């Protein structure tokens, strides 16, 4: 493998055995591709905005004399970039401008004669844009739109599994689900009649819908039944015989022909009898006359002479009727063929319960069901029915729905109309009856072929269409009412409803979520999440076990491990690593094609439906060099089941061992040795890890770390290769390679880094360069690390030296004992940034004022504020300190004449304002790192605001001019090259000032042209610079768009440094979580024979019952990695020859059985080897991919190479006594995470505070500054102990005895420790509640 210069800095040893056939895809593509589809112009009009416009336009007026047509649309440029939107608290969006054409037709002239055409571009609101990382900035906060897994449109056949009716009879049903429009359900009742429901309303007999479709009883019977034909000849009754129909029946008479008896009366008819009848080719047999009684007529029989209806269709025949029919000349009688086995009389029975007889009565019945209480008219009833399923505006199956519909009914065509046809409805009913008759199967609704993914683009398009439909109504009315000569398209379109619909979706939809931004992994996982909840999905309460369960079709599409614990389990899932959606929105996963027993590298993506037809081998199946299967029998999956198949039956093979898991689960090394429940916790807890001060790559990883770090977008990645020309903490400049430049550009890429900004979870986002000056970089190399990344690899926690042993009860029940060294070295110190805002409003009594002149506040409290009343940057503040001084006008109080006089003399004004300053919340302390002031347009800016503005302008100018200098230098170096090659002497040129170079003329025409081009570029560059600077200045100096009534907002950013402390929650990656119980002095920790103490002591009892053995293997492998690092470190210290170093590192990389990774250190220069060694000396990072990781033997080999015992256990000594522990202890390096459940955020205490209004009891919870709840059970405990006085004060003065508690407070102040309990307020509430029931209770004094 070829490594780039940057990748050579640190190579992770990979234990993977299987070749990597397919690279890990870009992990955010599900979001980006979907949104791209939504906003890009689609000439076919299938997707996105184009599809929405085409479905609503053209809008015709009611009279048809004019119409508004859609031509095209374009998205403008966003006003602010992403960072500016976040700072200002606005939405990152672009204006949508649509070109519309108003066409007016002549009234009197023939149809289609155009009178007037007007075209105009109309503004249609703002469309939020997606950032490069797949998020949206809405009102200044980053949000993610989660994809939804919903039931695919189409037709589904299902049964109630015998749960509805008490008899346990299985009732079948069919449901036609459109993409938009009314649902149509067909269902059987316990009596086997078929009913229909529209939109889950009251059920009607199913034949009503057929009558409404203009079918008569005769036609209905013709559609659903086969016929039995009787003929009357010579007063004998003969029946046309189809022998097949007789199977399994009992003969009720002798079946004979020409005197030969085939079946005797009372015998069961078998296949042998049928073969005999068929052999003799018998078509007619004579039957007794009674046999026809009870059969059902298949059509109407009319007396030809009188026109009288003798026997209507669907009537049971009797002997009298037979005689009548015979008399009126009907010699051939058609009856329905039914039996109990597989030809039920369902439709015939349904017609009998159907109250309607013709189309009109059927339509009226449907109208009454849909609109109860409204009087039906023929026209209204017809319109309603037409609009339900046959109108393109109201009903749409969508392409997916039509595809699923046709596939379900086994039709060949995949495409078709979006509305239903008569044939569609009849075929669905026929298939449902077939299923009831025992032919065919019901569908599995949890199959991923019946559930599809709706991503951002599609949901945004639907919301946009909703907005457009609202506008459509208004436009129709304007077209009909307005004066068409003066009307322009602009006058008809109101952008408000459209932007309101879009804004509502992005701002408050259940699927638009506040981004989980704890660390890069939580961002990626959030964007790859798939939810079954949300509009048009399930609800938590109604979802049963089946929906939540792992389904065989999840394989390679949805992760079986990563899902939340609690009420949402199984409803919220995560996309598997390689999964993607196909054009219809179904999840598909890649497989390698197997041709003639050879596994090729040809990749096919299969959806769940297609996969069912193939035999698929697992990724860990053994292959030989040619790619043939080694074993004759191979474990494969087929039709959702796993079993052994011979190797020539195999059609496909999995692409990778980590194909079935999600990104989160694929980061857990030795996942294959963990119990699934613990793996679930491990995958979920990695998302809660807080980025530490210095990221530390995991010694034991899975090889996915780099992909996650790069794709998450928190790192700066080189867009093009080149050389590092300049680097500082906030900017990296790359001089681009010649071959990657675009013609006629300066060839400079500038990367500005994010410094100390706040994430959604208040953690710190900061980027640090990891390249040095002059280094070569290639496209895709990581230039700067973000939060929780180390040299471009995900690094959520720290490698800790752990020992598994009990330690004086400090690790009882999952507690964790931590060494003081961990705190001293700041291993788990994290930075949290809080944003505190102070809003100055315009009140009824006058404007609030931000000022340092606050009444009744001492000098000390104001010491950290400047003259504008805003805190200085860099000030250290603690709980209760004033950050922004603000005063609010108080209502005028009635003044006495004396006070009025004094006020007139001394101008004393302080008493009419009250202090409403922004203070630091209790229990928070930290450093102010930034202050921002936003002022409304037209309000005078204070001194601090002007200072900040000045500073921002300076910074912007500096940034831009530096950028200009860099680009200029690049240009001038090219001009220099052209001039020198054109014959100008270099020495003379060096003496000439740069800006005069362009005045020189060259004789070589080609060179002169090049020079002129470069000169043009130079002018353009300067012009561009001026433009950018002007735009920047305008943005900075313009007033801010604040909410109504707000004059000023001051935002203060407070950085809090939090060290690890008892009560913080920590976890490994295997679901092994615990709370820190004690920080132990270093000298007391257990240590080995060399005196190296351990960092963390974990309880060995946390392992066996939880079956997460992965943590033990990780610990051993981590020890080996560290051992090798220490050996390299020793060699570096002794300044060994590079050859020796190279040889040792090479041995470490080559270790293992047929490992796929090949590292050849002979291709590395000595400097590169030394730099690699520098980066390996703290431990050699190792990758052990999921299901394809290091084997026990390999771990032992590696331990041996590191000079460590292969058991992974060593002798420890007690740090307090120096005594040796009795047994050897497992010691090694485990990757530990600090989770975002910090004791500082949870611990809280209250003495006095706020009370609930009704009950007068203290509030609860930290946010309300509440008290401890002394609940029902605690009261029982005191009662049981007979602690009467304690109980009395708990229920009175400490809770809601209002007078008692104020008196008590006074007494304590006076030093008198007495208490007099009174009446608790909650007792009064109880009395009031009883009175509200009309029962009077009065308390009488004895």
UniProtKB/Swiss-Prot annotation:
The RNAP catalytic core consists of 2 alpha, 1 beta, 1 beta' and 1 omega subunit. When a sigma factor is associated with the core the holoenzyme is formed, which can initiate transcription. The lineage of its organism: Bacteria, Pseudomonadati, Pseudomonadota, Gammaproteobacteria, Enterobacterales. Keywords: DNA-directed RNA polymerase, Nucleotidyltransferase, Transcription, Transferase. Belongs to the RNA polymerase beta chain family. It catalyses: RNA(n) + a ribonucleoside 5'-triphosphate = RNA(n+1) + diphosphate. It is an enzyme of class 2 (transferase). It comes from the Bacteria. GO terms for cellular component: DNA-directed RNA polymerase complex. One of its GO terms (biological process) is DNA-templated transcription. Pfam families: RNA_pol_Rpb2_1, RNA_pol_Rpb2_2, RNA_pol_Rpb2_3, RNA_pol_Rpb2_45, RNA_pol_Rpb2_6, RNA_pol_Rpb2_7. DNA-dependent RNA polymerase catalyzes the transcription of DNA into RNA using the four ribonucleoside triphosphates as substrates. Its EC number is 2.7.7.6. It comes from Enterobacter sp. (strain 638). SUPFAM superfamilies: beta and beta-prime subunits of DNA dependent RNA-polymerase. GO terms for molecular function: DNA binding; DNA-directed RNA polymerase activity; ribonucleoside binding. This is DNA-directed RNA polymerase subunit beta.
């Amino acid at each position: 493998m070829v490594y780039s210069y940057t990748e050579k800095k640190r190579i992770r040893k990979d234990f993977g055995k299987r070749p990597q056939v397919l690279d890990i895809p870009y992990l955010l593509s599900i979001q980006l591709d979907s949104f791209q589809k939504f906003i890009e112009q689609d000439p076919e009009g299938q997707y996105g905005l184009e599809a929405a416009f085409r479905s609503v336009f053209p809008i015709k007026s009611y009279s048809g004399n004019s119409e508004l047509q859609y031509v095209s649309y374009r998205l403008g440029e966003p006003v602010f970039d992403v960072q500016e939107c976040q700072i200002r608290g606005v939405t990152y969006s672009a204006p949508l401008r649509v070109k519309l054409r108003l066409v007016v037709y002549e009234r009197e002239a023939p149809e289609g004669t155009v009178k007037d055409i007007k075209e105009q571009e109309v503004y249609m609101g703002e469309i939020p844009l997606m950032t490069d990382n797949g998020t949206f900035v809405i009102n200044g906060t980053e949000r993610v739109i989660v994809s939804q897994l919903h039931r695919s449109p189409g037709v589904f056949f299902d049964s109630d599994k015998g749960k509805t009716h008490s008899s346990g009879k299985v009732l079948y049903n069919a449901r036609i689900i459109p993409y938009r429009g009314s649902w149509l359900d067909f269902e059987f009742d316990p009596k086997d009649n078929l009913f229909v429901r529209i939109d889950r309303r009251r059920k009607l007999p199913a034949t009503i819908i057929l009558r409404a479709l203009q079918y008569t009883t005769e036609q209905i019977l013709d559609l659903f039944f086969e016929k039995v034909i009787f003929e009357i000849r010579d007063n004998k009754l003969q029946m046309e015989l189809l022998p097949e129909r007789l199977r399994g029946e009992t003969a009720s008479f002798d079946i004979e022909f020409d005197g030969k008896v085939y079946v005797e009366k009372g015998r069961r008819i078998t296949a042998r009898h049928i073969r005999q009848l068929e052999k003799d080719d018998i078509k007619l047999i004579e039957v007794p006359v009674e046999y026809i009684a009870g059969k059902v007529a298949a059509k109407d029989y009319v007396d030809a002479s009188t026109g009288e209806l003798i026997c209507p269709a669907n009537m049971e025949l009797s002997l009298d009727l037979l005689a009548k029919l015979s008399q009126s000349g009907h010699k051939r009688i058609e009856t329905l063929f039914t039996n109990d086995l597989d030809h039920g009389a369902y439709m015939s029975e349904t017609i009998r319960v159907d109250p309607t007889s013709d189309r009109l009565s059927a339509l009226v019945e449907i109208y009454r069901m849909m609109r109860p209480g409204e009087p039906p008219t023929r026209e209204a009833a017809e319109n309603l029915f037409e609009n339900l399923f046959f109108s393109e505006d109201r009903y749409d199956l969508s392409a997916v729905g039509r595809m699923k519909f046709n596939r379900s009914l086994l039709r060949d065509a995949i495409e078709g109309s979006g509305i239903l046809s008569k044939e569609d409805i009849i075929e669905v009913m026929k298939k449902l009856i077939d299923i009831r008759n025992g032919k065919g199967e019901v569908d599995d609704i949890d199959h991923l072929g019946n559930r599809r993914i709706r991503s951002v683009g599609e949901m945004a398009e639907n919301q946009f269409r909703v907005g457009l439909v609202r506008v459509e109504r208004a436009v129709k009315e304007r077209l009909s009412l307005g004066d068409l000569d003066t009307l322009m398209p602009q006058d008809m379109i109101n952008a408000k409803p459209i932007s309101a619909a879009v804004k509502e979706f992005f701002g408050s939809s259940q699927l638009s979520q506040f981004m989980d931004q704890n660390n890069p992994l939580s961002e990626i996982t959030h964007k790859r999440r798939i939810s079954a909840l949300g509009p048009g999905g399930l609800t938590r309460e109604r979802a049963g076990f089946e929906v939540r369960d792992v389904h065989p079709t999840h394989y390679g599409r949805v992760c079986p491990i990563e899902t939340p614990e609690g009420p949402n389990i199984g409803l919220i899932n995560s996309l598997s690593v390689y999964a993607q959606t196909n054009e219809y929105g179904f999840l598909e996963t890649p497989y390698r094609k197997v041709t003639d027993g050879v596994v090729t590298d040809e990749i096919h993506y299969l959806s769940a439906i297609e996969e069912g037809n193939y035999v698929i081998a697992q990724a860990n199946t053994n292959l030989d060099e040619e790619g043939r299967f080694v074993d004759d029998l191979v474990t494969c999956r087929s039709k959702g089941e796993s079993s052994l198949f011979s190797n020539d039956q195999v059609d496909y093979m999995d692409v990778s061992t980590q194909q079935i898991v999600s990104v989160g689960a694929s980061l857990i090394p030795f996942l294959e040795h963990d119990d699934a429940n613990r793996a679930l916790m491990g995958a979920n807890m990695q998302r809660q890890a807080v980025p530490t001060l210095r990221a530390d790559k995991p010694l034991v990883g899975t090889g996915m770390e780099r992909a996650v770090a790069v794709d998450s977008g928190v790192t700066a990645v080189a867009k093009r290769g080149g050389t590092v020309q300049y680097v500082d903490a906030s900017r990296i400049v790359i001089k681009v390679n010649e071959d990657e430049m675009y013609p006629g550009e300066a060839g400079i890429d500038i990367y500005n880094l994010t410094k100390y900004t706040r994430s959604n979870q208040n953690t710190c986002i900061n980027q640090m360069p990891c390249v040095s000056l002059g280094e070569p970089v290639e496209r895709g190399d990581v230039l700067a690390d973000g939060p929780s990344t180390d040299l471009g690899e995900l690094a959520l926690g720290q490698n800790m030296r752990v020992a598994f042993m009990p330690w004086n009860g400090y690790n009882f029940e999952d507690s964790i004992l931590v060494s003081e060294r961990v705190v001293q070295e700041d291993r788990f110190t994290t930075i949290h940034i809080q944003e505190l805002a102070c809003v100055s409003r315009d009140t009824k009594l006058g404007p609030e004022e931000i000022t340092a002149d606050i009444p009744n506040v001492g000098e000390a409290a104001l010491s950290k504020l400047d003259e504008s009343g805003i805190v200085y940057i860099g000030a250290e503040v603690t709980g209760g300190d004033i950050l922004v001084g603000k005063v609010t006008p108080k209502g005028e109080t009635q003044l006495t004449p004396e006070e009025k006089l004094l006020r007139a003399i001394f101008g004393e004004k302080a008493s009419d304002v009250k202090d409403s300053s922004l203070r630091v919340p209790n229990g928070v302390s930290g450093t102010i790192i930034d202050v921002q002031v936003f002022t409304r347009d037209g309000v005078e800016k204070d001194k601090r605001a002007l200072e900040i503005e000045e500073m921002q302008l300076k910074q912007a100018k500096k940034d831009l001019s530096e950028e200009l200098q860099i680009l200029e230098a690049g240009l001038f170096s090219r001009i220099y090259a052209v001039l020198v090659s054109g014959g100008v002497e270099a020495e003379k040129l060096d003496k000439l000032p740069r800006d005069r170079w362009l005045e020189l003329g060259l004789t070589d025409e080609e060179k002169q042209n090049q020079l002129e081009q470069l000169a043009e570029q130079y002018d353009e560059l300067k012009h561009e610079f001026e433009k950018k600077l002007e735009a920047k200045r305008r943005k900075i100096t313009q007033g801010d768009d604040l909410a109504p009534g707000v004059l000023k907002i001051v935002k203060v950013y407070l950085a809090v440094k939090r060290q690890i402390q008892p009560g913080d929650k920590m976890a490994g990656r295997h679901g092994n979580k615990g709370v820190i119980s004690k920080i132990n002095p270093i000298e007391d920790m257990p240590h080995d024979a060399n005196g190296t103490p351990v960092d963390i002591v974990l309880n060995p009892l946390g392992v066996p019952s939880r079956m997460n053995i992965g943590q033990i293997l990780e610990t051993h492998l981590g020890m080996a990695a560290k051992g090798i690092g220490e050996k390299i470190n020793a060699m570096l210290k002794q300044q060994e020859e590079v050859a020796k170093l190279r040889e040792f590192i090479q041995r470490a990389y080559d270790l293992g059985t047929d490992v796929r990774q090949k590292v050849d250190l002979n291709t590395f220069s000595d400097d590169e080897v030394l730099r690699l060694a520098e980066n390996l000396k703290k431990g050699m990072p190792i990758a052990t991919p999921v299901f394809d990781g290091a084997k026990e033997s390999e771990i032992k080999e590696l331990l041996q190479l590191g000079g460590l015992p292969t058991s992974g256990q060593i002798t420890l000594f007690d740090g307090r006594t120096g005594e040796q522990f009795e047994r050897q202890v497992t010691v090694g390096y485990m990757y530990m995470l600090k989770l975002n459940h910090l004791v500082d955020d949870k611990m809280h205490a209250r003495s006095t505070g706020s009370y609930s209004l009704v009950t007068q009891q203290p509030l609860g919870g930290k946010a309300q500054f509440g008290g401890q709840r002394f609940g029902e059970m605690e009261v029982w405990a005191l009662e049981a102990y007979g602690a009467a006085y304690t109980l009395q004060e708990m229920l009175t003065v400490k809770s809601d005895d209002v007078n008692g508690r104020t008196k008590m407070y006074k007494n304590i102040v006076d030093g008198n420790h007495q208490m007099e309990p009174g009446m608790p307020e909650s007792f009064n509430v109880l009395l009031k509640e009883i009175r509200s029931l009309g029962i009077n209770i009065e308390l009488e004094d004895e």
